[in-house]
């Protein structure tokens, strides 16, 4: 969702020091700008994501395949340099596909015309997954579940399912949407998710804040017919929430049946309910998930139907209708069974002066708030293009201070015992340079949750405590079995550990440079 929409709906409601340059061998070089004092407060584990959306981004349509690939590499490189460890990439904006699909047409946002394949043919999602994983980053496939069109100007072919079976859809405020009341629609959306989960090495399936449509003044949702057929005597608002609940539960079960380690994440609007509506609600006066979008995020948390939530707290710290300072604490206190990260708006954060110090922006306070709250495990930056474009120095601030160390993602819940340790660490020296290499534990033929998929390399200075809990000691997070060492001087020590698909870490194996 755009920042402008967030601001509008809130108002209406008053309503160590090492950088990685990734090729197939990771090169370790010194980062002179990182001081130990800046890195001290950076946790070893933290989710640091960024959304890269395709909808509304016409730059994709004007690029050749080679240029589009270069663009993806550039964007992911810049996110990694800013300290991010997860890419949330939009692959289904409007019942279409930014990947090869037999279920839905190619996205017009990619090629300029819905159904038109890129030429020469390539698969943007597969390419982005490979590039993220090369850099040790997670890839979350981001889908919008219900939206079919985003504007009234879009014309769908006569063969489109919304024209063939119009009763399964409704039009609202210039958009066409799947009617959440239909089991056929839930089945179809889950089939799309099953297909992605089965065919692609995604780390998560991610859906955003669009459930029932955001309310337009004076316009009622045109679902009278489906309510009469399927309401079963329920209150209409409860019935709408129930329809969304059914999809969330079915999506979670679909993903876990296909690949138990793939996570299901949701980034809802930043207000569940206001306190004046419900005593359990937040000190806010904006639009409400529960009442306006029919999305009961607290129920999903209670039922265990979601692995993580990222409430979109895109407002300034003390915004009147939706103060993010209070809302972040509310979410911390009310999400109990699900991992919680905070959606932060880069532009609003960098534009807004800190209320207690007008000589700086709100970035420091927002990061500090999230890190000081027990149940918050990280942040996700909206949008990633503002990070990669270094809006008002945002990327510099992240790279030099707030995300200056390499962070491992949090440990996730799931089956398995965790990964085995690596074996036989060696330091090789040749005309090409010095390399640290190791033998990885063998994975079986069948994919498992505790497969070894990434490796963490630690470097310790002479006399330094060999503590793998020290975030400053991490110098590489990589899927490869070999890294180049710039200056393996005598007295240095190295450790290598394994991460599995749930980011559980093996015991370290050490090497001492003599």
Regions found by a protein language model. Give the residues of each.
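Pro/Thr/Ser/Gly-rich low-complexity, intrinsically disordered linker/stalk tracts
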Residues: 393-449, 503-514
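Solvent-exposed loop/turn segments flanking beta-strands in beta-repeat/beta-sandwich domains
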Residues: 441-469
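Catalytic domains of carbohydrate-active enzymes, especially glycoside hydrolases
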Residues: 70-96
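Substrate-binding cleft of secreted/luminal carbohydrate-active enzymes
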Residues: 294-320, 338-415
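Aromatic-lined carbohydrate-recognition surfaces of secreted/lumenal glycan-active proteins
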Residues: 138-148, 206-209, 240-289, 339-347
